[in-house]
Amino acid sequence: KRMAIRLPQPKAYENYYEDIALFALPVEDAADEMQAKITCVNLATTGNVKAAQTVNMDAAGVIRSSYPCYIQYEYEQPFTCRNIEIVLNGNNYQAHRLKVMASDDGVNYRLVKQLVPARQGWQNTDENSTHSIPPTTARFFRFYWTPEGSEPGSEDMDAAKWKPNLKIKELRLHREARLNQWEGKAGLVWRVAQATKEEEVGKQDCYSLSQVINLTEQYTSHSNGKTLTATLPKGKWKLLRMGHTATGHTNATAGGGKGLECDKFNPKTVQKQFDNWFAQAFAKTNPEVARRVLKYMHVDSWECGSQNWNKRFAIEFQKRRGYDLMPYLPLLAGIPMESVEQSEKILRDVRTTISELVVDVFYQVLADCAKEYDCQFSAECVAPTMVSDGLLHYQKVDLPMGEFWLNSPTHDKPNDMLDAISGAHIYGKNIIQAEGFTEVRGTWDEYPAMLKALLDRNYALGINRLFYHVYVHNPWLDRQPGMTLDGIGLFFQRNQTWWDKGAKAFSEYATRCQSLLQYGHPVTDIAVFTGEEVPRRSV
């Protein structure tokens, strides 16, 4: 039967949206979700537990708890669940540690799955998280949580280091099969998750290429959406309209430069950002003087989410991977195709292509620009925010750099230093820099002996050039404590009580150490394979 259907435009940011493809996928039944009665039950047994601290749901439906509890979804009729989408208001590691139980009668429960958090970066809030489970039909689903057994705070996962509290905006139970943690695997956000298991998504749940109909050429543009005019085979079909838009993510620490970032896969947009940023120092001054004075161009740690598409991505993918991505595009929405093994492989190829483009386009263009202006190129980490190989971009920079934190275990990520150090060793860079003593919620209690132990550790790891975070210009003579960066960073300026003697002695010590270290060359006795997973880091 020939039909004409108007298709609404998918969600867009920054008034930008462009279509990529339209697919028709056969479905057996409509995937209407059923309403459930939601109950939260506190399981704390200690006598000193305060009522305000037990599990509760606020007026907006956000569930909070600091004590063992469960969340129950009760359906009037048996409901088949294949995946659980976790929606958060912020970064909550504990929400991904739920134990899923199911029951037919509300009395006898069986284990469905213990959810396992993905390894995640500190900007983990850009996307929801979808956990696949074995197909389970039941009237009651319980999600148990306990702070016991929480990871004390592993690398990258800032939220795992915080006091274990549960905070969930919404749990969405879905009938349709989805790949486990597909949001990270599609390159939407920096995550490393377990592969989808066949008992969760079987061969019968995966679309074959022959089942999927590409309708991209059969729908026309309208001012308020798209209209599809097509004839589909008899049966029930789901239309999947796929497009690309801005992430909506803006950099947050750039002061006057706050705003959207350029397309990292397009050399023209990278060049434009450089021309309207760093090159302006030469355009608005005497260029000959600027060349003598301005000798370094620095790109700081990447803090603006990830990117997984642009207009040429499919072309680059085919050139680099040797096959056409377009027929498999539904995978980027988590829809399994061919088999879970094939689906995981193709999405890994997507992430590999992303990581290569970041280096071959963004960092290569900036390296060429720096050379054009007789500057050395300094750069910090791209992980754990942009989907990437955390070491690969250091081949393009002259001066690799990482960062280490002071008295901030919830934010310190030693891999930031290890990425820079290992990357420098691999690509033969003798100067290895560090943004040192970055701090959050500073309490004004730092002193040279405290700083020395931390600095010595990082010298031993492999750095040989220190940048103080933060040493800010303080223009005032009549204000105390003077210029700071609020609670961020070391208080290292002339109003520090030990400045006159301590700062000079400490700086001279650092200068002597790194002067000697820069004369040397690293002797690396062990090579460690970082694996084939993407994203990846030094450890």
Residue ranges and their predicted role:
Residues 1-51, 65, 73, 81-83, ...:
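Carbohydrate-binding surfaces of carbohydrate-active enzymes
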Residues 1-47, 147, 151-156, 162-248:
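Active-site "lid/cap" and pocket-lining segments within catalytic core domains
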Residues 56-108, 113, 127-202, 301:
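Aromatic, loop-rich ligand-recognition surfaces of beta-strand-rich domains
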Residues 115, 129-133, 213, 228-230:
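Generic detection of short hydrophobic beta-strand segments and adjacent strand-loop junctions
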Residues 117-121:
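Surface-exposed loop and turn segments in beta-propeller and other repeat-based domains
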Residues 204-216, 277-280, 293, 300-306:
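Hydrophobic alpha-helical membrane-insertion signals
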Residues 232-264, 391-408:
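Aromatic- and acid-rich polysaccharide-binding/catalytic face
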Residues 243-248, 256-281, 515-518, 522-539:
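Catalytic grooves of carbohydrate-active enzymes
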